[in-house]
Amino acid sequence: MIRVTCGVYSLLNCLYLPQVSYVIRDEVEKYNRNGVNALQLDPALNRLFTAGRDSIIRIWNVNQHKQDPYIASMEHHTDWVNDIVLCCNGKTLISASSDTTVKVWNAHKGFCMSTLRTHKDYVKALAYAKDKELVASAGLDRQIFLWDVNTLTALTASNNTVTTSSLSGNKDSIYSLAMNQMGTVIVSGSTEKVLRVWDPRTCQKLMKLKGHTDNVKALTLLNAECLSGSSDGTIRLWSLGQQRCIATYRVHDEGVWALQVNEGFTHVYSGGRDRKIYCTDLRNPDIRLLICEEKAPVLKMELDRSADPPLASKRTTVNPDIVLSSGDYENDCSTPLSPICSQPDQVIKGGASIIQCNILNDKRHILTKDTNNNVAYWDVLKACKVEDLGKVDFEEEIKKRFKMVYVPNWFSVDLKTGMLTITLDESDCFAAWVSAKDAGFSSPDGSDPKLNLGGLLLQALLEFWPRTHINPMEEEENEVNHVANGEQENRIQKGNGYFQVPPHTPVIFGEAGGRTLFRLLCRDSGGETESMLLNETVPQWVIDITVDKNMPKFNKIPFYLQPHSSSGAKTLKKDRLSASDMLQVRKVMEHVYEKIINVDTESQTTSSSNNEKPGEQEKEEDIAVLAEEKIELLCQDQILDPNMDLRTVKHFIWKSGGDLTLHYRQKST
């Protein structure tokens, strides 16, 4: 038995380096952005639950044929939702996700009640025993855990510990799971190509069934009979009593990924990679129907058992009363069939999924292309879409927006959910500095300060977290100084002072290995519970920038400065210089003019100028103008634009190892 504490996973339990992610999206995502992995139907309320690869569970009214069927979204997962089961007569929903968690939901109100974190890898499958209100979960960590649903629904903030049993013995990742209604038998399918059978009451393994030649992707179980669908393209019927396969159905041309059976276990509905859905009579396998053909592989099916008559009996050729003949048999139906349903009764449309992206070289904007071939332009810093460009040439748009500017990488992009997920790691989050002017921001005092993009973004993401409003070291002093005259609230500085991100933006604190520690919306970080959980999960490198306001150091770049060979000047001592990588070429030109060229001029004119130094008479702005008029700076014999910075020169022109070398010469008159 294992005791599990539900809720947030503390930083103290981190196995990998912590990171921060956020999703750029609309406030309400009504449509499935990616594949639908699982379905559950509540016939009493005419509600369909869909679990998406966009991390969202959605609720639909299946009676709304003409009006918008969307009811609500259930959002708390951060990766693909792989499976869902309805329990307690539709009151409770259990979900399994690639974020390694199992979540318990109030299905009627649509909120997450608790989170189970026992799995160490993707959770791929769930199984439900209706008579016992027992749920099993399994995944890529090869573990199966058993959960009492009534215990899960009774969990509270103070009573947040639950006991679970585990079934060990699988040698490979588990992709499918089935349990009978009485909760006395569990069957698992895996990449081991076998079925393993357990008694959940004793946690003892009963048998191992061999026969498939590829991953077992789908299972269904009734009493002592089990059906399995595999990526090897076959459906197999197993007798648990005889511990062997008693029938093999070769209905599909490719892998079988989804199975459903009628209540009498006489007909099986199957779908998979070949996009076809068949109904096969288990007792007479020569009788089969091609129900329909989809436009994409079938990931999951749900049979509406309340339909009268059921789909399989709409054709007189299907006889539900046929009894299985004695003996084993194997069918191979190769005769082409025409689908009996050319059009679906109802279609719940999905949304476009982002399938391609390009980070522009300003390291702030992204171009994306979706499944409808629409191109969009995004601002990573402000976490928003800037413009829909429509069906335009993606590569041409990239070329149009190219700028001769180099900014270091400071974030990574993931398209797994069909939306833009931006991830910040401590190793490079603070690598990118830009000037406020270049970023399009104005400073109140008219100056042009240097801004750290990662730092600004973190401050914006946690703008509503009270701990970031006042440095705890200064809080007491501020209260003494300002409470008396009511000015404290006005003096609290929130965010970064330049921009805000949309308050609905989901922020995710997790591990580099994929495990999620905590997910919340930006606007919710001011809540008492959320604020407390942030104290436990926000990593120190984020605290440093958002709470303590400790800005990272500027990036330095070493370089050498030498006269150009065409100038005829003697080569100087090769001193290694160092400056901010954002230093503009014009500043180096000013240095050359003032400290090198002007010094030579002074030594030649001292005797005839009454000891007046030209440098003393020139204002700073005059030096800048004169430097550009008289000095050229070169790299690899290419004349440099004064507006370039050193990092751009090194990236686009120097293009080689070792320290950057710049040459100067006077312009020919």
What are these language model-derived features?
Residues 1-40, 44-64, 311-345, 492, ...:
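Intrinsically disordered, low-complexity acidic/Ser/Thr/Pro-rich linker and tail segments
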Residues 24-31, 69-76, 112-118, 138, ...:
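Short C-terminal beta-strands that terminate individual repeats in beta-propeller domains
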Residues 39-45, 85-90, 127-132, 178-183, ...:
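Loop/turn segments within WD40 beta-propeller blades
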Residues 51-54, 96-99, 137-141, 149, ...:
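Conserved strand-to-loop turn within each blade of WD40 beta-propeller repeats
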Residues 57-62, 102-105, 126, 144-149, ...:
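WD40-repeat beta-propellers
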Residues 495-669:
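Extended, C-terminal alpha-helical/coiled-coil scaffolding tails that mediate protein-protein interactions
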